[in-house]
Structures are given as C-alpha cells and as structure tokens.
Design a protein with these regions (language model features):
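Residues immediately within or flanking Cys/His clusters that coordinate Zn2+
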Residues: 7, 25
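Short cysteine-rich clusters marking metal-coordination/redox-active sites
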Residues: 10-13, 28-31
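Short functional micro-motifs and their immediate structural scaffolds
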Residues: 18-19, 36
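Conserved N-terminal beta-strand and adjoining loop/helix that marks the start
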Residues: 30-54, 74
Length: 209
C-alpha cells in the first residue's frame, strides 16, 4: 500500500491527475506539484523523580485509549524538540518548572537536595540548568482519523520532584508516579512507547541514565 493511497486529489490545485511519483510521494500532472509523505516529528518524556519512580499516564483518547503511555505529542511548527517536550509536559500535567537547557545530573547523584518547587538544579558556577536530556529516537505509526501517520519519536529523560503538583490535562485521562518494577511493558498501547520503555530500562541497568 502506498503511503498516499488515500490522497486522490492534488492538495494544491484539486486535480485528479495526482499520481504515484515514488514510494513516498505523489506528483500532480496538472500543476506540477509534488508532495512527499515525510515522518512527523514527535516527543516522548520518560519522567522520573528523585525516588526513582516513573510518571505514567493513561491515554484518554484514541488511538489506544485506556492504555498506558508517557507524556508526549507532536512537535508544533516553529518548535525544536526541547521546546516541544516542555510544552507537552505543561499541557498534559500542568507542571511549568521546566525550560530547555543543558543537562544536569539528578540532585541525589550530586549529593544535593532538590530545590523545592522546581525541576532546576545549579552547577558549581551557579548556572541554572534544565533537567531534561535526549535519550534516543524511534520510528512509530499513529492511526488518527483513519489515516496512518508515520512519526519519528524523540525520547527525553526528564527529572521532576516527587512533590510536584501534577494534574492530568489535554488528552491524558490520568497520570501518577509508579515504581519501575510495577510497570509492565505490555500495558503500553503504542509501539514506540513499549520499545522505548524497554530500551530505557536497559540503559538504567547499565548505569547510563
């Protein structure tokens, strides 16, 4: 099946002369427009607190409604990955203590206390740094309104205090802290979330996160 099989008309001029150009594109023989079906950019936040608990969410909307997931979503036009993951965390949990910036290790690893009410920490020169870090990326498919969207999901490791006031918003039905040993990969509804969780736990075992 061609990626654009459902697209029968040119999105620029409306002509029916919209034919296959290559495996991921179609070309309009009427106006010359060529459309390429490229992967959409998305972000996923694997969030931990200083106790080592992970923040899990229950999906409130299709696809995979009712299954577990991580906080995340698609990158908006004009955003970078870092800005997108901060926005998604704010939209879906209400937490506004993050700003894109250089990575700082968790406070417990530095022998320091977390600053109350903030996910920031300070390094030796007093510079404030954000506790979010890029982990890896994975391909994913996302069925929405009958159209299969191919995405490239960028995974972040994010640190938020356990006493942060979080409230499920947007398309998240609920979110809560959970011990890693109680989290089952098969309870996650989206493919990249399952694979991402497995990879993250493997990195944890190796001491790489």
């Amino acid at each position: 099946m061609h990626y654009l099989e459902q697209w029968n008309y040119c999105p620029k001029c409306g002509s029916k002369q919209f034919v296959v150009h290559d495996f991921k594109s179609k070309h309009c023989e009427a106006c010359g427009f060529t459309y390429y079906f490229n992967a959409a950019a998305a972000v996923i936040a694997i969030i931990e607190n200083e106790k080592g608990e992970m923040l899990v969410a229950r999906r409130g909307e299709e696809p995979a409604k009712g299954t577990l997931d991580f906080i995340g979503g698609f990158v908006d036009p004009g955003e970078g990955f870092e800005e997108a993951v901060v926005r998604e965390i704010e939209e879906e949990t209400g937490w506004r203590g993050l700003t894109p910036g250089p990575w700082t290790p968790p406070a417990p690893l530095r022998g320091e206390k977390w600053r109350e009410g903030s996910s920031y920490s300070q390094d030796g020169d007093g510079e404030e740094r954000s506790n979010l870090k890029v982990l890896f990326s994975l391909p994913n498919t996302y069925l929405y309104s009958g159209l299969t969207i191919h995405s490239c999901d960028c995974f972040f490791h994010v640190l938020i205090p356990s006493d942060a006031k979080l409230k499920a918003n947007d398309d998240v039905a609920a979110c809560w802290w959970e011990k890693p040993e109680n989290i089952k990969v098969e309870d996650f509804g989206l493919h990249s979330a399952r694979i991402g969780l497995q990879r993250f736990l493997e990195l944890k075992k190796k001491g790489k996160v």
